[in-house]
Amino acid sequence: MPAGTAARAWVLVLALWGAVAGGQNITARIGEPLVLSCKGAPKKPPQQLEWKLNTGRTEAWKVLSPQGGPWDSVARILPNGSLLLPATGIVDEGTFRCRATNRRGKEVKSNYRVRVYQIPGKPEIVDPASELTASVPNKVGTCVSEGSYPAGTLSWHLDGKLLIPDGKETLVKEETRRHPETGLFTLRSELTVIPTQGGTHPTFSCSFSLGLPRRRPLNTAPIQLRVREPGPPEGIQLLVEPEGGIVAPGGTVTLTCAISAQPPPQVHWIKDGAPLPLAPSPVLLLPEVGHEDEGTYSCVATHPSHGPQESPPVSIRVTETGDEGPAEGSVGESGLGTLALALGILGGLGVVALLVGAILWRKRQPRREERKAPESQEDEEERAELNQSEEAEMPENGAGGP
């Protein structure tokens, strides 16, 4: 149940109970003392009275003793017959009854229905938008209220007037959480709107209400936002995989309609000028392609604030192995075959060049030896002549001695 409905139902039940039971509805702030008077009770002893209560602290009716007891820290009877709750809490919500006999001997009953409340801090709009775009959904912000009891409600206002969600141009997402220890509530309300074109600078605010009498709502600081006209989407592009749109029979073709626009437009597909009966999607998958899938494809993007925009067409063609144009998967194989052939030719030329070089080198070796042989013979003749001249000089030197 939404927090607002729960609060209104609580107020209605409280009013009906007071009317039917003839009791009095009491609201007390959490943590503050509360005094309930016992009607008809004498202000001074001797007194004949009885207080009993049924609250979150008890499983059934609890009768309090005028002489005091363990419950004095929670609720105790004062000398004048009134009941004091030193510090009310959520567990003190419930029914309190007093039965007293006045001086005339008449019995008087008092009934109280006690509810507690806690006023939270001032609500706040977190993550507010800096501007709004016309004709498209925009998140205005999130209104947050912390530390309330009961939960209460959050409401949005536009230019000072209550903004009622319609589920179309005005959307509100609410969330209510309760602290497991304190029992206090935290409320969050996210507002999304679709501004109209040509609008001015709208002012948004949020308010919190406990739904109790004589309690004024708490308001956030207002935020004023600028509404800008949506610009035309950029060019639409149709991507195809495999590139070129050529595929072997049984292969897969993926068509992607790429367009930069916010919010994303609806994309429909066209084949050979006729719309395809498919759900809107920016991706078209063609598995196990056959010749019946051949044709010209294009995509049409429809933006809320602009007319439809069609992409340039692409052609899908199914080719058998050996046909003109390589089939999908054969491009890499033919490329590798060509590379291997080129490497084989280069390797063969290299071997031939090595053989020719070896043959030429072998032919040049005998010529070099022939050239070296005469040179060595002349050297020997020169050496012989030198030796003869040296031998002739030696006797002459011997004859000239003493």
Curated annotation (Swiss-Prot):
Q: How does it assemble?
A: Constitutive homodimer; disulfide-linked. Forms homooligomers. Interacts with S100A1 and APP. Interacts with S100B, S100A12 and S100A14. Interacts with TIRAP. Interacts with HMGB1. Interacts with LGP2; this interaction plays an important role in AGER-mediated pro-inflammatory responses and cytokine release. Interacts with double-strand break repair protein MRE11 which is a core component of the MRN complex; the interaction enhances MRE11 endonuclease activity and promotes DNA repair.
Membrane-spanning ranges: 341-361
Task: Report the outcome of S389E.
Answer: Phosphomimetic mutant which does not lose the ability to reduce DNA damage
Describe the disruption phenotype: In deletion mutant mice, the elevation of serum TNF-alpha, IL6 and EDN1 and the tissue damage induced by LPS is significantly attenuated when compared with WT mice. The lower hepatic expression of pro-inflammatory cytokines, while the activation of immune cells remains unaffected, results in improved survival after challenge with D-galactosamine. Accumulation of fibrotic tissue and senescent lesions in lungs of mutant mice. Lungs show a more distorted loose pattern of alveoli and the peri-alveolar region, and there is a marked reduction in pulmonary function.
Q: What lineage does the source organism belong to?
A: Eukaryota, Metazoa, Chordata, Craniata, Vertebrata
Keyword Cell membrane applies: yes
Mainly localized where?
membrane
A GO MF annotation of the entry reads:
identical protein binding
Indicate where the modification Phosphoserine is found in the sequence. Answer: S376, S389
Q: What is this protein called?
A: Advanced glycosylation end product-specific receptor
Q: Which residues are in coiled coils?
A: none
* Subcellular location per the Swiss-Prot or TrEMBL entry: Cell membrane; Cell projection, Phagocytic cup; Early endosome; Nucleus
Q: Which domain of life is it from?
A: Eukaryota
The disulfide bonds in this chain are C38-C98, C143-C206
Biased segments, Acidic residues type: 376-394
